[in-house]
Amino acid sequence: MVMSGGTFWRNQSGATMVEAAIAMPVLLTLLLGFVDFGYAFYQWNAGNKAVQAGARLAQISAPIASGLLLEAKTPSDPLDVGKAVPANTYSYICTASAAGAVSCSCGTGATCQNLNVSQAAFDFIFSGSSSRPGMLTFLPTLLKSEVQIQYQASGLGYWTRPSGPVPTITVSIVNHPFQFFFLAGFLGFGTITMPSMLSTATGEDMKSTWTP
């Protein structure tokens, strides 16, 4: 049957199918995009919890940088605690290779006693123990090479440990990737690098630096 031109242009049969074909890709992109970005925010929050846990372990554990043991101790006079830190004081920056081997460098403008390291101390902060969760507990996709731990002179003191250096400890996660799942197929999104995450704490009961 041949349909006249006027009737053809007024015919709306099949319009719903056309509208669905237009709307469904947009709807699916929005819906699955919410899932992907929700998972990204979940990983972001997990990363922040990981650096908080790492900073807490670092401030109560033996330092990774062995040279910290040789640094100037907290002033014996409590009135001197909190005064300005002299130039060229210590700043140990510890990172791990892709294989997980830790090494430390001296921060720009700082003076460090030596750059010997404790692999066990780094592994404890990263992995934790049976009784204490480490960074990996909160972010299972984390790699050792993405963790940076810095011990820097602060001029602060810790009242219950007057004979040991009290560094400012900063634990960071850098270059941690996020892989899109749904949007990788829909829009070609690949892997992105998440912004750096860090947590800073003042050293407390670092037992290897404590002298009764």
Which residues does each PLM region occupy?
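N-terminal leader/signal peptides at the extreme start of proteins
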Residues: 1-13
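Membrane-interface junctions
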Residues: 11, 20-23, 40
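Short amphipathic alpha-helical interface segments enriched in basic and hydrophobic/aromatic residues
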Residues: 32-35, 39-40, 55-59
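Membrane-proximal amphipathic alpha-helices
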Residues: 39-48, 61-64
